[in-house]
Amino acid sequence: MRCAIRTGVLSLAAVLSISAPLCAQNDLDQRINREADSLLATYKYLHENPELSTQERETSTLLAADLKKSGYEVTDHFGQYTEPGLNAYGVVAVLRNGPGPAVYVRTDMDALPIIENTGLPYASHVKVARAGGGEVGVMHACGHDLHMTVFLGTARMLGQLKDRWSGTVVLIGQPAEETVGGAQAMLRAGLFTRFPKPDYVLALHDTSAVPAGKVSWHAGPLLAGADSVDITVRGYGGHGAAPQAGKYPIVIASEIVVALQTIVSREMDPQLPTVVTVGSFH
Protein backbone atom coordinates (compact mmCIF):
# COMPACT_ATOMS: atom_id res chain seq x y z
CA MET A 1 0.00 0.00 0.00
CA ARG A 2 2.90 2.36 0.68
CA CYS A 3 3.99 1.82 -2.94
CA ALA A 4 0.49 2.59 -4.24
CA ILE A 5 0.27 5.78 -2.18
CA ARG A 6 3.71 6.95 -3.28
CA THR A 7 3.00 6.17 -6.95
CA GLY A 8 -0.32 8.01 -6.87
CA VAL A 9 1.11 11.15 -5.27
CA LEU A 10 4.11 11.12 -7.59
CA SER A 11 1.98 10.70 -10.71
CA LEU A 12 -0.38 13.57 -9.88
CA ALA A 13 2.49 15.80 -8.83
CA ALA A 14 4.29 15.04 -12.09
CA VAL A 15 1.20 15.83 -14.15
CA LEU A 16 0.96 19.15 -12.33
CA SER A 17 4.48 19.96 -13.60
CA ILE A 18 6.33 20.36 -10.33
CA SER A 19 8.89 17.65 -11.01
CA ALA A 20 10.44 18.27 -14.42
CA PRO A 21 14.20 18.66 -13.74
CA LEU A 22 16.08 15.68 -12.33
CA CYS A 23 17.05 17.60 -9.20
CA ALA A 24 13.42 18.56 -8.68
CA GLN A 25 12.41 14.92 -9.16
CA ASN A 26 14.86 13.78 -6.49
CA ASP A 27 13.59 16.44 -4.11
CA LEU A 28 10.00 15.40 -4.76
CA ASP A 29 10.89 11.77 -4.07
CA GLN A 30 12.44 12.74 -0.76
CA ARG A 31 9.48 14.87 0.25
CA ILE A 32 7.02 12.07 -0.53
CA ASN A 33 9.14 9.61 1.44
CA ARG A 34 9.05 11.96 4.43
CA GLU A 35 5.26 12.06 4.26
CA ALA A 36 4.87 8.32 3.68
CA ASP A 37 4.38 7.23 7.30
CA SER A 38 1.83 9.96 7.95
CA LEU A 39 -0.06 9.18 4.75
CA LEU A 40 -0.07 5.44 5.47
CA ALA A 41 -1.52 6.12 8.92
CA THR A 42 -4.19 8.30 7.31
CA TYR A 43 -4.99 5.55 4.82
CA LYS A 44 -5.43 2.97 7.57
CA TYR A 45 -7.65 5.31 9.58
CA LEU A 46 -9.85 6.03 6.57
CA HIS A 47 -10.09 2.32 5.76
CA GLU A 48 -11.03 1.47 9.33
CA ASN A 49 -13.64 4.24 9.58
CA PRO A 50 -15.63 4.26 6.33
CA GLU A 51 -18.86 6.19 5.80
CA LEU A 52 -21.63 5.56 3.29
CA SER A 53 -22.76 7.95 0.55
CA THR A 54 -24.27 11.21 1.89
CA GLN A 55 -22.98 10.30 5.38
CA GLU A 56 -19.33 11.37 4.97
CA ARG A 57 -19.28 13.74 7.95
CA GLU A 58 -16.12 12.55 9.72
CA THR A 59 -14.34 11.76 6.46
CA SER A 60 -14.90 15.25 5.07
CA THR A 61 -13.86 16.79 8.39
CA LEU A 62 -10.55 14.90 8.24
CA LEU A 63 -9.89 16.03 4.67
CA ALA A 64 -10.78 19.64 5.42
CA ALA A 65 -8.48 19.78 8.46
CA ASP A 66 -5.53 18.28 6.57
CA LEU A 67 -6.01 20.68 3.65
CA LYS A 68 -6.12 23.69 5.97
CA LYS A 69 -2.79 22.60 7.46
CA SER A 70 -1.34 22.60 3.95
CA GLY A 71 -2.35 26.24 3.45
CA TYR A 72 -5.57 25.89 1.45
CA GLU A 73 -8.71 28.02 1.70
CA VAL A 74 -11.27 25.35 2.59
CA THR A 75 -15.03 25.31 2.17
CA ASP A 76 -16.70 22.28 3.69
CA HIS A 77 -20.29 21.03 3.87
CA PHE A 78 -20.57 22.07 0.23
CA GLY A 79 -23.34 20.76 -1.99
CA GLN A 80 -27.09 20.77 -2.44
CA TYR A 81 -29.14 17.61 -2.76
CA THR A 82 -32.69 17.63 -4.08
CA GLU A 83 -33.75 14.95 -1.60
CA PRO A 84 -35.01 16.45 1.67
CA GLY A 85 -33.03 15.83 4.84
CA LEU A 86 -29.67 15.06 3.21
CA ASN A 87 -26.65 16.97 4.46
CA ALA A 88 -23.94 17.88 1.97
CA TYR A 89 -20.37 16.97 2.88
CA GLY A 90 -18.48 18.16 -0.18
CA VAL A 91 -15.07 19.75 0.36
CA VAL A 92 -13.52 22.46 -1.84
CA ALA A 93 -9.97 23.65 -1.15
CA VAL A 94 -8.32 26.46 -3.11
CA LEU A 95 -4.62 27.32 -3.33
CA ARG A 96 -3.90 30.47 -5.36
CA ASN A 97 -0.34 30.85 -6.58
CA GLY A 98 -0.12 33.66 -9.10
CA PRO A 99 -1.20 33.73 -12.75
CA GLY A 100 -1.85 30.55 -14.66
CA PRO A 101 -4.49 27.90 -15.31
CA ALA A 102 -7.01 26.63 -12.80
CA VAL A 103 -6.53 22.92 -12.22
CA TYR A 104 -9.02 20.75 -10.35
CA VAL A 105 -7.90 17.60 -8.55
CA ARG A 106 -10.77 15.43 -7.40
CA THR A 107 -11.23 12.51 -5.01
CA ASP A 108 -14.27 10.52 -3.99
CA MET A 109 -14.95 9.93 -0.28
CA ASP A 110 -17.75 7.42 0.27
CA ALA A 111 -17.64 3.69 1.03
CA LEU A 112 -19.87 0.73 0.17
CA PRO A 113 -22.47 -1.25 2.16
CA ILE A 114 -20.31 -4.38 2.39
CA ILE A 115 -19.15 -6.45 5.38
CA GLU A 116 -15.34 -6.60 5.42
CA ASN A 117 -13.80 -10.04 5.85
CA THR A 118 -10.20 -9.28 4.88
CA GLY A 119 -8.74 -9.99 8.32
CA LEU A 120 -6.56 -6.89 8.08
CA PRO A 121 -5.49 -5.36 11.41
CA TYR A 122 -7.13 -2.12 10.26
CA ALA A 123 -10.24 -3.77 8.79
CA SER A 124 -13.55 -1.97 9.09
CA HIS A 125 -15.97 -3.16 11.73
CA VAL A 126 -18.41 -0.33 11.08
CA LYS A 127 -22.09 -1.20 10.86
CA VAL A 128 -24.98 1.16 10.28
CA ALA A 129 -28.74 0.82 10.34
CA ARG A 130 -30.23 -0.49 7.14
CA ALA A 131 -33.30 1.16 5.67
CA GLY A 132 -36.17 -1.16 6.49
CA GLY A 133 -34.48 -2.61 9.56
CA GLY A 134 -31.36 -4.47 10.54
CA GLU A 135 -27.73 -3.48 10.03
CA VAL A 136 -25.31 -3.39 7.13
CA GLY A 137 -21.52 -3.40 7.17
CA VAL A 138 -19.53 -0.54 5.66
CA MET A 139 -16.23 -0.98 3.80
CA HIS A 140 -13.91 0.95 1.51
CA ALA A 141 -14.03 -1.81 -1.11
CA CYS A 142 -13.59 0.48 -4.12
CA GLY A 143 -10.37 2.23 -3.15
CA HIS A 144 -11.69 5.60 -2.11
CA ASP A 145 -9.52 5.42 1.02
CA LEU A 146 -6.47 5.18 -1.24
CA HIS A 147 -7.79 7.93 -3.51
CA MET A 148 -8.18 10.31 -0.55
CA THR A 149 -4.71 9.49 0.74
CA VAL A 150 -3.13 10.23 -2.64
CA PHE A 151 -5.26 13.39 -2.81
CA LEU A 152 -3.93 14.63 0.54
CA GLY A 153 -0.36 13.72 -0.37
CA THR A 154 -0.67 15.68 -3.61
CA ALA A 155 -2.09 18.64 -1.70
CA ARG A 156 0.88 18.61 0.66
CA MET A 157 3.38 18.49 -2.20
CA LEU A 158 1.70 21.40 -4.00
CA GLY A 159 1.69 23.43 -0.80
CA GLN A 160 5.37 22.74 -0.14
CA LEU A 161 6.54 23.37 -3.70
CA LYS A 162 4.75 26.58 -4.64
CA ASP A 163 7.96 27.97 -6.15
CA ARG A 164 7.75 25.35 -8.94
CA TRP A 165 4.31 26.08 -10.34
CA SER A 166 1.98 28.99 -11.02
CA GLY A 167 -1.79 29.14 -11.19
CA THR A 168 -4.67 28.01 -9.03
CA VAL A 169 -5.30 24.53 -7.68
CA VAL A 170 -8.80 23.56 -6.57
CA LEU A 171 -9.05 20.28 -4.68
CA ILE A 172 -12.47 18.62 -4.65
CA GLY A 173 -13.65 16.08 -2.09
CA GLN A 174 -16.71 14.58 -3.77
CA PRO A 175 -19.37 12.90 -1.63
CA ALA A 176 -21.85 10.26 -2.78
CA GLU A 177 -19.86 9.03 -5.76
CA GLU A 178 -21.16 5.49 -5.40
CA THR A 179 -24.77 6.66 -5.58
CA VAL A 180 -23.86 9.12 -8.39
CA GLY A 181 -25.54 12.13 -6.72
CA GLY A 182 -22.59 13.90 -5.11
CA ALA A 183 -21.14 15.54 -8.22
CA GLN A 184 -24.54 16.91 -9.21
CA ALA A 185 -25.04 18.23 -5.67
CA MET A 186 -21.77 20.17 -5.85
CA LEU A 187 -22.56 21.57 -9.29
CA ARG A 188 -26.03 22.52 -8.11
CA ALA A 189 -24.48 24.49 -5.24
CA GLY A 190 -22.41 26.52 -7.71
CA LEU A 191 -19.03 24.79 -7.88
CA PHE A 192 -18.09 26.50 -11.15
CA THR A 193 -19.47 29.92 -10.15
CA ARG A 194 -18.29 30.21 -6.53
CA PHE A 195 -14.82 28.90 -7.33
CA PRO A 196 -12.44 29.34 -10.29
CA LYS A 197 -13.75 27.55 -13.35
CA PRO A 198 -11.34 24.75 -14.29
CA ASP A 199 -9.08 24.70 -17.31
CA TYR A 200 -8.15 21.11 -16.48
CA VAL A 201 -9.62 18.44 -14.23
CA LEU A 202 -7.55 15.53 -12.92
CA ALA A 203 -8.75 12.37 -11.20
CA LEU A 204 -7.48 8.85 -10.69
CA HIS A 205 -8.81 5.43 -9.79
CA ASP A 206 -6.95 2.44 -8.46
CA THR A 207 -7.12 -0.81 -10.41
CA SER A 208 -5.81 -4.33 -10.02
CA ALA A 209 -5.20 -4.41 -13.79
CA VAL A 210 -2.04 -2.30 -13.44
CA PRO A 211 0.95 -3.58 -11.42
CA ALA A 212 1.84 -1.72 -8.22
CA GLY A 213 4.30 1.07 -8.92
CA LYS A 214 3.00 1.75 -12.42
CA VAL A 215 0.48 4.29 -13.74
CA SER A 216 -1.90 4.01 -16.68
CA TRP A 217 -3.27 7.23 -18.16
CA HIS A 218 -5.75 8.34 -20.78
CA ALA A 219 -6.68 11.75 -22.16
CA GLY A 220 -10.38 12.50 -21.79
CA PRO A 221 -13.02 10.31 -20.15
CA LEU A 222 -11.75 6.84 -19.23
CA LEU A 223 -14.14 5.12 -16.86
CA ALA A 224 -17.88 4.92 -17.42
CA GLY A 225 -20.40 7.51 -16.37
CA ALA A 226 -23.20 6.11 -14.28
CA ASP A 227 -26.89 6.54 -13.72
CA SER A 228 -29.39 4.49 -11.77
CA VAL A 229 -33.08 3.74 -11.74
CA ASP A 230 -35.39 1.95 -9.32
CA ILE A 231 -38.23 -0.08 -10.83
CA THR A 232 -41.18 -1.20 -8.71
CA VAL A 233 -43.36 -4.01 -10.04
CA ARG A 234 -46.70 -4.35 -8.29
CA GLY A 235 -48.81 -7.47 -8.33
CA TYR A 236 -50.07 -10.29 -6.16
CA GLY A 237 -49.53 -14.00 -5.94
CA GLY A 238 -51.96 -16.86 -5.96
CA HIS A 239 -52.22 -20.58 -5.56
CA GLY A 240 -49.67 -22.53 -7.56
CA ALA A 241 -52.45 -24.68 -9.01
CA ALA A 242 -54.41 -21.63 -10.18
CA PRO A 243 -51.86 -19.25 -11.74
CA GLN A 244 -54.56 -17.48 -13.71
CA ALA A 245 -55.84 -15.96 -10.48
CA GLY A 246 -52.65 -14.05 -9.70
CA LYS A 247 -50.52 -11.29 -11.17
CA TYR A 248 -47.05 -12.49 -10.31
CA PRO A 249 -44.52 -9.65 -9.81
CA ILE A 250 -41.54 -12.03 -9.71
CA VAL A 251 -42.31 -13.35 -13.20
CA ILE A 252 -42.89 -9.85 -14.56
CA ALA A 253 -39.73 -8.49 -12.94
CA SER A 254 -37.71 -11.41 -14.31
CA GLU A 255 -38.89 -10.57 -17.82
CA ILE A 256 -37.82 -6.97 -17.26
CA VAL A 257 -34.32 -8.09 -16.23
CA VAL A 258 -33.94 -10.12 -19.43
CA ALA A 259 -35.37 -7.33 -21.59
CA LEU A 260 -32.95 -4.78 -20.15
CA GLN A 261 -30.03 -6.81 -21.47
CA THR A 262 -31.19 -6.22 -25.03
CA ILE A 263 -30.61 -2.48 -24.66
CA VAL A 264 -26.88 -3.06 -25.06
CA SER A 265 -27.06 -5.90 -27.58
CA ARG A 266 -29.70 -4.37 -29.87
CA GLU A 267 -29.97 -0.64 -29.20
CA MET A 268 -26.36 0.52 -28.71
CA ASP A 269 -23.46 0.91 -31.12
CA PRO A 270 -21.26 -2.15 -30.44
CA GLN A 271 -18.16 0.05 -30.76
CA LEU A 272 -19.22 2.12 -27.75
CA PRO A 273 -18.52 0.74 -24.24
CA THR A 274 -21.91 0.33 -22.59
CA VAL A 275 -23.23 -1.85 -19.79
CA VAL A 276 -26.61 -2.26 -18.11
CA THR A 277 -26.50 -4.01 -14.74
CA VAL A 278 -29.34 -5.07 -12.49
CA GLY A 279 -27.65 -4.79 -9.12
CA SER A 280 -30.49 -5.69 -6.77
CA PHE A 281 -33.67 -7.75 -7.03
CA HIS A 282 -35.94 -8.14 -4.02
Predicted regions, residues:
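Residue-level recognition of conserved structural "scaffold" positions that shape functional pockets
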Residues: 15, 97, 150, 188-189, ...
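A generic alpha-helix preference that emphasizes hydrophobic side chains
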Residues: 18-22, 29, 43, 183, ...
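Histidine/acidic-residue-rich, glycine-tolerant segments that coordinate divalent metal ions
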Residues: 90, 127-139, 145-146, 158, ...
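N-terminal secretory signal peptides that target proteins for export/translocation
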Residues: 1-5
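Bacterial N-terminal signal peptides
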Residues: 8-20
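Acidic/His- and Gly-rich active-site-bordering loop/insert found
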Residues: 25-140, 149-166
